[in-house]
């Protein structure tokens, strides 16, 4: 099993930046995976839209062995390592060399977990992707939209009833102009449950210092408040589940900054 640390030591930073490969620390992967399975006993079909080396699959398999995982990635280098790492699990883990945003929309999943690529609008062919998302979801995303939010919106649309989603992404969309439409969709879909803002100053994402947020969503059509937590020390990440401020959906305005 080649770990993210070993891979990063062998594969140059230029290559990893080209494919926006900033790997999730395992304790964060475990935390996100716990959300996927919490009160979701029938969860058996899971999607990893940005598979990488499979840190989420490792966390998943620690919790449930009878599972079906579908993964996507476009980088031959990381795919070769990932497929070797999970060669003995090929019956339950399917990893495709394909662009998730080009995959079929009608596939549905009980759990979706992801650390998507972080690419600015000028670093990828955003026009085609944005048109597809707008067409499928009825959104009005603009040309400055970061690719990680496209992953997020498509994934929400692919949840089964009762399905759960955990994403870790930059928090910039909470305050940016392009994020207004993203937040509007999150509110209108009724799936957003919890936003955990985490200061990663002391826990770099593999050479990428960032303030990120973890999003928990569920498709359950229930009336609920939306929780917000801010974590300054990643060692206290689990405290976000009990230490939060909650708002009714009607109290949140997509056009207002959500992070102070």
Which residue ranges define each predicted feature?
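Short, high-confidence coil segments that cap the C-terminus of an alpha-helix
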Residues: 41-43, 109
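Signature of N6-adenine DNA methyltransferases within the class I
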Residues: 13, 17-18, 22-33, 50-67, ...
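N-terminal, positively charged/glycine-rich alpha-helical extensions of SAM-dependent methyltransferases
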Residues: 1-14
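Conserved beta-strand elements of the Class I
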Residues: 45-47
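Glycine-rich helix-loop-beta junction characteristic of Rossmann-like nucleotide cofactor-binding loops
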Residues: 35-41
């Amino acid at each position: 099993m080649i770990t993210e640390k070993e891979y990063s030591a062998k594969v140059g930073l230029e290559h990893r930046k080209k494919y926006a490969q900033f790997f999730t620390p395992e304790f964060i992967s475990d935390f996100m995976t716990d959300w996927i399975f919490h009160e979701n006993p029938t969860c058996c079909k899971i999607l990893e839209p940005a598979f990488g080396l499979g840190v989420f699959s490792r966390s998943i398999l620690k919790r449930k062995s009878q599972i079906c995982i579908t993964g996507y990635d476009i980088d031959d280098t990381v795919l070769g390592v990932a497929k070797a790492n999970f060669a003995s699990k090929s019956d339950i883990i399917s990893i495709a060399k394909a662009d998730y945003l080009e995959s079929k929309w009608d596939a549905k999943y009980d759990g979706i977990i992801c650390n998507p690529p972080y690419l600015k609008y000028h670093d990828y062919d955003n026009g085609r992707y944005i048109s597809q998302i707008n067409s499928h979801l009825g959104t009005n995303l603009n040309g400055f939209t970061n690719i990680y939010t496209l992953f997020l919106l498509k994934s929400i649309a692919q949840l089964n009833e009762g399905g759960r989603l955990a994403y870790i992404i930059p928090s910039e969309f909470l305050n940016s102009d392009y994020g207004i439409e993203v937040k509007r969709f999150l509110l209108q879909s009724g799936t957003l449950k919890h936003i955990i803002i985490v200061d990663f100053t002391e826990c770099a994402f593999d050479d990428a210092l960032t303030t990120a947020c973890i999003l928990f969503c569920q498709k359950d059509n229930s009336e609920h408040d939306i929780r917000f937590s801010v974590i300054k020390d990643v060692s206290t990440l689990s405290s976000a589940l009990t230490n939060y401020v909650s708002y009714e959906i009607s109290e949140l305005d997509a056009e207002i900054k959500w992070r102070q």
